């Protein structure tokens, strides 16, 4: 069978093989560097790290399915050629199509869930948490719904690899599912991109620091794989365009090369982007500090190791801060301003108490 298939004109399956051979090691290296960066700090493995591991397993399995589709299911050859030389290969192709589409739907959101968990740790504001939780629900719902639709979209199940007439009669509109299945990814990508920007830019910090932080989140959200390819948002859009412009069922084995590349690339880019966001300790170890230090209003400078955007902590037992800078003041006439109320508290005597919330750096730890 291999010799017959290799004789096909315009064979393009090798492109998919080369892509998998290059891209899969990149994801493995990215995850390995993430955990090495974590080992440089006192941080323990958390739920976000386990999601990254699961996403990497999903990426490796997807690469295996893609290679199997090339070797056993005729991907890269024209369907007409396969119909003449080896019709059974087309049946194998549609079986691989079910496996690939179901696996993609159920695993592509894992790395983005890890990013959501990271954002929840960085941004403690209640409103931000509501947006993040909603985004996570959308991701989980899209994964479960998409996976079930891909897997059980045909009744009987064997209609998945039946003739075109059988698929039309017994299956949902699978092509529309493939096209619009990426749309929730685009929406959640935009949310994760926009979410940190107002908070970061509103910090009482230098313009340089704010620019560095904005670029950090920007690289993780849009240019997450700047050194190796496209970005999470860009790959979602390009995958959507590819599926929209190229029918999955017109010369499917030939068009599958490009479509599978985007299907493997998209979650892999999310995975690399999620890893890039926590490389700060690694970059500092090799002499590439992202920020030289942060100066607070009190004049203290600390080397940043973990970025957090925290609410002011409530003093215990109603205690109040009795000193500002090097001087001291009486606690008379001052009250604690709640986390959700940042308005100045005006008391008798013309005293105004305000709280400035700035970047907090936790020494000896990393995101």
Curated annotation (Swiss-Prot):
<feature type="transmembrane region" description="Helical">
    <location>
        <begin position="16"/>
        <end position="36"/>
    </location>
</feature>
<dbReference type="GO" id="GO:0016020">
    <property type="term" value="C:membrane"/>
</dbReference>
<keyword id="KW-1133">Transmembrane helix</keyword>
<protein>
    <recommendedName>
        <fullName>Polyenoic acids biosynthesis gene cluster protein Ba17b</fullName>
    </recommendedName>
</protein>
<keyword id="KW-0472">Membrane</keyword>
<feature type="transmembrane region" description="Helical">
    <location>
        <begin position="50"/>
        <end position="70"/>
    </location>
</feature>
<feature type="transmembrane region" description="Helical">
    <location>
        <begin position="183"/>
        <end position="203"/>
    </location>
</feature>
<feature type="glycosylation site" description="N-linked (GlcNAc...) asparagine">
    <location>
        <position position="245"/>
    </location>
</feature>
<comment type="pathway">
    <text>Secondary metabolite biosynthesis.</text>
</comment>
<comment type="similarity">
    <text>Belongs to the SAT4 family.</text>
</comment>
<dbReference type="InterPro" id="IPR052337">
    <property type="entry name" value="SAT4-like"/>
</dbReference>
<keyword id="KW-0325">Glycoprotein</keyword>
<dbReference type="InterPro" id="IPR049326">
    <property type="entry name" value="Rhodopsin_dom_fungi"/>
</dbReference>
<feature type="transmembrane region" description="Helical">
    <location>
        <begin position="259"/>
        <end position="279"/>
    </location>
</feature>
<feature type="transmembrane region" description="Helical">
    <location>
        <begin position="90"/>
        <end position="110"/>
    </location>
</feature>
<feature type="transmembrane region" description="Helical">
    <location>
        <begin position="211"/>
        <end position="231"/>
    </location>
</feature>
<keyword id="KW-0812">Transmembrane</keyword>
<dbReference type="Pfam" id="PF20684">
    <property type="entry name" value="Fung_rhodopsin"/>
</dbReference>
<feature type="transmembrane region" description="Helical">
    <location>
        <begin position="137"/>
        <end position="157"/>
    </location>
</feature>
<comment type="function">
    <text>Part of the gene cluster that mediates the biosynthesis of (2Z,4E,6E,10E)-9-hydroxydodeca-2,4,6,10-tetraenoic acid (BAA), (2E,4E,6E,10E)-9-hydroxydodeca-2,4,6,10-tetraenoic acid (BAB), and (2Z,4E,6E)-octa-2,4,6-trienedioic acid (PBA). The highly reducing polyketide synthase Ba17a is sufficent to produce PBA and BAA. The still to be characterized protein Ba17b leads to an increased production of BAA as well as to the production of the new compound BAB.</text>
</comment>
<feature type="glycosylation site" description="N-linked (GlcNAc...) asparagine">
    <location>
        <position position="133"/>
    </location>
</feature>
């Amino acid at each position: 069978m291999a010799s017959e298939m290799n004789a096909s004109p315009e064979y393009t399956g090798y492109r998919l093989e080369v892509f998998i051979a290059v891209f899969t090691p990149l994801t493995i290296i990215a995850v390995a560097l993430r955990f090495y960066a974590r080992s440089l700090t006192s941080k323990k493995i958390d739920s976000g790290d386990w999601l990254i591991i699961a996403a990497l397993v999903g990426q490796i399995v997807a690469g295996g399915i893609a290679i199997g589709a090339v070797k056993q299911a005729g991907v890269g050859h024209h369907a007409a050629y396969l119909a003449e030389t080896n019709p059974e290969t087309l049946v194998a192709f549609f079986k691989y199509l079910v496996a690939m589409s179901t696996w993609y739907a159920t695993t592509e959101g894992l790395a983005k869930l890890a990013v959501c968990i990271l954002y929840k740790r960085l941004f403690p504001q209640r409103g931000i948490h509501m947006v993040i939780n909603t985004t996570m629900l959308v991701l989980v719902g899209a994964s479960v719904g998409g996976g079930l639709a891909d897997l059980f979209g045909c009744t009987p199940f064997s209609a998945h690899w039946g003739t075109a007439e059988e698929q039309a009669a017994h299956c949902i509109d699978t092509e529309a599912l493939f096209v619009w299945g990426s749309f929730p990814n685009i929406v959640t990508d935009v949310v994760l991109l926009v979410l940190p920007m107002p908070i970061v830019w509103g910090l009482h910090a230098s313009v340089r620091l704010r620019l560095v932080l904005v670029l950090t989140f920007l690289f993780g959200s849009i240019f997450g794989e700047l050194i190796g390819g496209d970005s999470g948002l860009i790959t979602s859009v390009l995958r959507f365009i590819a599926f929209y412009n190229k029918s999955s069922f017109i010369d499917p084995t030939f068009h599958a090369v490009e479509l599978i590349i985007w299907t493997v690339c998209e979650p892999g880019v999310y995975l690399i982007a999620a890893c890039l966001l926590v490389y700060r300790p690694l970059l500092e170890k090799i002499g590439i500090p992202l920020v030289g230090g942060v100066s607070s209003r009190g004049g203290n400078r600390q080397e940043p190791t973990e970025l957090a955007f925290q609410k002011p902590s409530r003093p215990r037992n109603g205690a109040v801060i009795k000193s500002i800078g090097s001087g001291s003041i009486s606690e008379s006439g001052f009250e604690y301003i709640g986390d959700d109320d940042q308005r100045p508290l005006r008391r008798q005597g013309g005293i105004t108490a305000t709280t400035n919330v700035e970047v907090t750096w936790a020494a000896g730890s990393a995101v």
